[in-house]
């Protein structure tokens, strides 16, 4: 979502609360519960899952491995659910030409640096950069080059849904708004 006026451009970023993350967190949680249930069934010697005859699975080595996969899956699933709950990666980019300030805010993981807040002067922006990598795993990332600070990504590095036309359009609009050149690498 964007909000734009003559002097201010605010772009809100979604973060980790995406449908795909919810989907994979649910699938991983349910799958790991299934593995753990099969491992527990083989240990107890009782059929806890009516669909699968898990009494035929020996506890050592198959039941141990299934239990290990179930526990590992629960840990990974809990990590995904925590990133969704904390909404890691969400935030905003605010470009204010009137004040001459650019603010970049992102939510991180809990701790001392949970709130990531970067502030720059518009006159320190050297250029807007576009990185394009084609092939099996295409990447199109928009960067802002800051004098003395290096480059800062403005789009998510895992965002593969930008077509070349969309990323060019976004870079051109932002460069025009900030009155800086565009570089492609």
Curated annotation (Swiss-Prot):
GO terms for cellular component: chloroplast thylakoid membrane; photosystem I. It is found in: Plastid, Chloroplast thylakoid membrane. Pfam families: Ycf4. GO terms for biological process: photosynthesis. It is a multi-pass membrane protein. The chain crosses the membrane at residues 21-43, 63-85. Its main location: plastid. Keywords: Chloroplast, Membrane, Photosynthesis, Plastid, Thylakoid, Transmembrane, Transmembrane helix. Seems to be required for the assembly of the photosystem I complex. Belongs to the Ycf4 family. This is Photosystem I assembly protein Ycf4. It comes from Zea mays. The lineage of its organism: Eukaryota, Viridiplantae, Streptophyta, Embryophyta, Tracheophyta.
